[in-house]
């Protein structure tokens, strides 16, 4: 979030009010588009998407946050982006899984064979993108973790439910194992890497805020444990 604010200041000057407001205004505008796109992916209705965009654009809190150099609008943007990526992943993975099930049925004379595990849903590239956005959201504010945890459970539920709809055997247990572990790596693993990368400037700097706090406040007994 602070990097995004700094980008506007770098372009228009750090003493220019427009510079430190620019990124928030841009991200707030893009957030309206994400709300509309999420509504369209959920309901496949341009009317619903338009109503969602209008409601988002006239929301008082969202309007105010888009005018200020605060972190909330950037957190909302990355959380929305995570959700949209997961919606796209649901769409793509279900399409891939359905194609594989149809192919198996055709090979078996039109009847789906009773496989123990069933086919996988392929590479979840959109879920990887969701992991990137999730890491960025946590990099803005730690309380984004609550949203990410809910999204992680939601994406696994979608995958498991897709297997149930297609009539695959042992859809609950197999789906949770086959989709849950990759989802954890893609959401949490990738997100953790992205989150740590947001601290790159702090690690590279020698005079960053609290950069040498651990050295100046060594622990007692267990040396890595601070005194207070």
Where are these regions (language model features)?
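Membrane-interfacial entry segments at the cytosolic side of transmembrane helices
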Residues: 166-189
């Amino acid at each position: 979030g602070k990097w995004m604010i700094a980008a506007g200041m770098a372009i228009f000057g750090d003493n220019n009010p427009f510079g430190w407001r620019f990124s928030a205004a841009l991200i707030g505008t893009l957030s309206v588009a994400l709300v509309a796109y999420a509504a369209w992916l959920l309901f496949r209705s341009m009317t619903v998407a338009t109503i969602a965009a209008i409601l988002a654009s006239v929301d008082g809190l969202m309007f105010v946050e888009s005018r200020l150099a605060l972190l909330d609008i950037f957190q909302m943007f990355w959380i929305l982006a995570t959700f949209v990526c997961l919606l796209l992943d649901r769409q793509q993975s279900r399409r891939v899984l359905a194609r594989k099930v149809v192919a198996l049925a055709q090979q078996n004379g039109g009847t789906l064979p009773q496989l123990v595990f069933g086919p996988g849903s392929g590479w979840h590239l959109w879920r990887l993108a969701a992991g990137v956005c999730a890491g960025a959201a946590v990099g803005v504010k730690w309380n984004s973790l609550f949203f990410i945890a809910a999204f992680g459970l939601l994406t696994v539920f979608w995958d498991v439910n897709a297997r149930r709809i297609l009539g695959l055997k042992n859809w609950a247990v197999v789906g949770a194992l086959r989709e849950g572990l990759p989802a954890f790596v893609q959401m949490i693993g990738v997100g953790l890497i992205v989150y740590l990368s947001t601290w790159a400037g702090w690690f590279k700097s020698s005079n960053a805020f609290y950069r040498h706090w651990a050295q100046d406040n060594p622990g007692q007994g267990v040396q890595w444990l601070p005194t207070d």
